[in-house]
């Protein structure tokens, strides 16, 4: 791999579609190798835009806007960081040879749609999943929920971070769940997936790297499993490693390898799985760094962002664990623009702790504005430290 100089004819150019906190870390990792970074988002001042060489504000659900921007910037790689993207434009860009889409346009298109990835995993690949059905009206949702059985979960086929998700306890919940899903869905979607509830012991994210190896073939590397705790479909803390018994570990890696190889391309994938004893079920997969994987910034030899970048650039990867670690989310707490944070000196007094503030220009009470990270000799101590550090960071609304 030859890498030139940013802002020169020799530069390797990467365009990030989506410039949130995960994209910011990807941008920083890219810049360590002298890659020219172009950050794109729907609003100005997004986290990755603050560290990129250039930035653009566009409607990423507009195929024409995406196509025109790629033609203007001529990146070598287009790296999606979010789901709310006009994936048809990525297919056209890839087909025309304008840029390499990471991991590839088909993978991005399938994984941004819960119906696409569920049908691939369950019906084509034969992977174990929860029972499921799809619905595109309130009446169809009622029928699907009755078929799957109560309690069950309802999710828009296109959404992220828990948006639009509901737990249905009885038929009386259907209308509210349908309305909530329509409000939380993306790209004008009004279709939902109904999932049966699995009685699992815990959830994991198995960060899986698909990267070129000698001879040009793609090799697979696994990080240690990441455990996480969610509220309302969004993660609030994660830790690594999550202990699995040998049989469950073998099954988890087999499922992850199968789905990642089926998607193809190169990069890091966040494969979400349910685990109960020896049993493992596929849940979802993201073809990019995963929010629960932010813990790897203190736990691994190379964090998930570095692994993603190395896979993209064809560089050697090392997914080994160095030390148990944990992360805990820091929320906005208030609804305001340009908030401040207090208590960092107390947070960083926690042993082996770090804090990342994302720099998002606008806060909401439940918006993720930062994360506390901690390492320790044990996962339990790392979790305690991360939660303590996060609790000491206080968002403050600045008077106008």
Swiss-Prot record:
InterPro entries, per the entry: ATP-grasp, ATP-grasp_carboxylate-amine, ATP_grasp_subdomain_1, PreATP-grasp_dom_sf, PurT, PurT/PurK_preATP-grasp, PurT_C, Rudment_hybrid_motif
Higher taxonomy: Bacteria, Pseudomonadati, Pseudomonadota, Gammaproteobacteria, Methylococcales
Gene Ontology biological-process entries: 'de novo' IMP biosynthetic process
Superkingdom to which the source organism belongs: Bacteria
Organism: Methylococcus capsulatus (strain ATCC 33009 / NCIMB 11132 / Bath)
Binding of N(1)-(5-phospho-beta-D-ribosyl)glycinamide, residues: 21-22, 81, 291, 360, 367-368
Gene that produces this protein: purT
Pathway: Purine metabolism; IMP biosynthesis via de novo pathway; N(2)-formyl-N(1)-(5-phospho-D-ribosyl)glycinamide from N(1)-(5-phospho-D-ribosyl)glycinamide (formate route): step 1/1
Residues given in the record as Mg(2+) binding sites: 272, 284
Enzymatic reactions: N(1)-(5-phospho-beta-D-ribosyl)glycinamide + formate + ATP = N(2)-formyl-N(1)-(5-phospho-beta-D-ribosyl)glycinamide + ADP + phosphate + H(+)
Disulfide bridge positions per record: none
A single cellular component GO annotation: cytosol
Listed name of the protein: Formate-dependent phosphoribosylglycinamide formyltransferase
């Amino acid at each position: 791999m030859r890498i030139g100089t940013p802002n020169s004819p020799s530069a390797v150019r990467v365009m990030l579609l989506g410039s949130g906190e995960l994209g910011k870390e990807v941008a920083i990792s890219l810049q360590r190798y002298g890659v020219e970074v172009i950050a794109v988002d729907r609003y100005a001042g997004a986290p990755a835009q603050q560290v990129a060489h250039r930035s653009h504000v566009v409607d990423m659900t507009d195929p024409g806007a995406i196509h025109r921007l790629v033609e203007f910037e001529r990146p070598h790689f287009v790296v999606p960081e979010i789901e709310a993207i006009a994936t048809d434009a990525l297919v056209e860009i890839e087909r025309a040879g304008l840029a390499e889409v990471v991991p590839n346009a088909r993978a991005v298109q399938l994984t941004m749609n819960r119906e696409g990835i569920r049908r691939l995993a369950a019906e084509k690949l034969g992977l174990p999943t929860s029972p499921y059905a799809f619905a595109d009206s309130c009446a169809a949702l009622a029928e699907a929920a009755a078929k799957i059985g109560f309690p069950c979960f309802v999710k828009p086929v296109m959404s992220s971070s828990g948006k639009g998700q509901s737990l249905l306890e009885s038929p009386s919940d259907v209308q509210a769940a349908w309305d909530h899903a329509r409000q939380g869905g993306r790209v004008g979607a009004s279709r939902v997936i109904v999932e049966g509830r699995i009685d699992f012991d815990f959830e994991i994210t198995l960060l899986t790297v698909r990267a070129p190896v000698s001879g040009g073939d793609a090799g697979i590397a696994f990080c240690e499993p990441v455990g996480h705790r969610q509220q309302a479909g969004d993660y609030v803390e994660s830790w690594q490693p999550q202990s699995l018994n040998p049989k469950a570990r073998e099954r988890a890696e087999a499922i992850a390898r199968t789905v990642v190889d089926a998607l193809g391309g190169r990069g890091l994938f966040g494969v979400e799985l349910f685990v109960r004893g020896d049993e493992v079920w596929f849940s979802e997969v993201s073809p990019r760094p995963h929010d629960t994987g932010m813990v790897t910034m203190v736990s691994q030899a190379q964090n998930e962002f570095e692994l993603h970048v190395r896979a993209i650039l064809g560089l050697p990867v090392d997914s080994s664990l160095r030390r148990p670690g944990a992360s805990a989310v820091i929320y906005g707490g208030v609804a305001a623009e340009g908030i401040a944070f207090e208590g960092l000196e107390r947070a960083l007094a926690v042993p082996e702790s770090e804090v990342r503030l994302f720099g998002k220009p606008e806060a909401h009470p439940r918006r993720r504005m930062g994360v506390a990270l901690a390492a320790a000799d044990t996962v339990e101590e790392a979790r305690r430290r991360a939660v303590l550090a996060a609790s000491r960071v206080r968002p403050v609304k600045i008077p106008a």
